[in-house]
Amino acid sequence: MNPFMNEDFFLCGETAEKLYHGVAERLPIVDYHNHLSAKEIFENKQPKNIAQLWLGADHYKWRLMRANGVPERMITGDAPEDQKFFAYAETLPYAIGNPLYHWSHLELQRYFSIDTPLCGDTAAEVWQRANERIAQGGFSPRELLLRVGVVARCTT
């Protein structure tokens, strides 16, 4: 059995692994549906921390936090950014089976080299490690789009 969230996560079998790693992994991405802000891409600002990157405008994460009873102040309100991130970390274990659970962990692995499952107990460590990586640069909207090979995108 493969470990959880390895490079072949969601690839069920040898054929899937060959097709993905041999062909699809290196293809350019034409993204027909996303919720990226055209204004943020134009401004191309470097985020200061993972809360700005992840929680600044992600209505999927906001909805998950609301469903978990997180006060609005900790979602879109005036709470400190680290506290918003910690609230998301506390929420995430309740999302097993929701794509956000997998997406969040895939992003931690691919962009931050963090394999630690995100939860309340690990939030401070993940916050620190992710922010150290963000401080090195390369996380502005355009830099991220180029890094993953997006050649065209359409946004809502």
Specify the residue positions occupied by each region the protein language model found.
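Metal-cofactor-binding active-site regions of metalloenzymes
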Residues: M1-T156
